[in-house]
Amino acid sequence: MEKLYFDDTTYIWKTKLNLVEYKKLLLKEAIDVIESQPEVKSDGFGYKQEWKENLNFLGEIIINNKLDEVVKRGINCCKEIYKEKNIEYNKINTDAWVNLVRSNNPVQIQFKHDEMRGVDKYHTHTEINKKNKSFFPHYTYVYYIQMPDVMEGEDGVLYFRGENKKEYWIRPEEDDIIVMEGWMPHAPNNAPKSTIDRVVLAGNVGFEFIKKEKSLL
């Protein structure tokens, strides 16, 4: 993976998964996930959340469809990056979701009202998981299934906020997978003139070492 630096302490990793030929299938599977959860009024639609319940889960999954393949490869990207830390682990915690930024009537609050643009647009997955009493995510990956077809200025970009409070951005392309530290403040921008929505599959990955209790037998 390519490591892209915005400054000395602000960086992401990026590569291609070479799944462009499967875009229609990936999009169909993602839409199926969205349509299966009509009660969800936010922009995130949970996918295979049961993985985080498996104590012995080490990133090996049975691939039943293309979304599963993306999840598997997203986990592998995070494992590759974490390997550089040379820290032992025996459990991987993970979750995944389909994220939708609508070109028309987006549900994110910063797009609903002009006066809210730029206000509290950032989020971090360490904070989200803490509030949800879930695992600590070392990394978050995002795979871009579909990007807007009309983008002007900073439409469609992904914003990052560094430790120096400076704002940076990158405009992802379809088939990009981006990995960031779980604590990285980030925010997607919409593209109001686009005729199609931004659709991604994203996930958190956390590494843990669980001490095994010795049996008295």
For the regions a protein language model found, what residue spans apply to each?
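Catalytic core of non-heme Fe(II) oxygenases with the double-stranded beta-helix
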Residues: 87-190, 196-200, 204, 208-214
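Non-heme Fe(II)/2-oxoglutarate
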Residues: 1-90, 97, 119
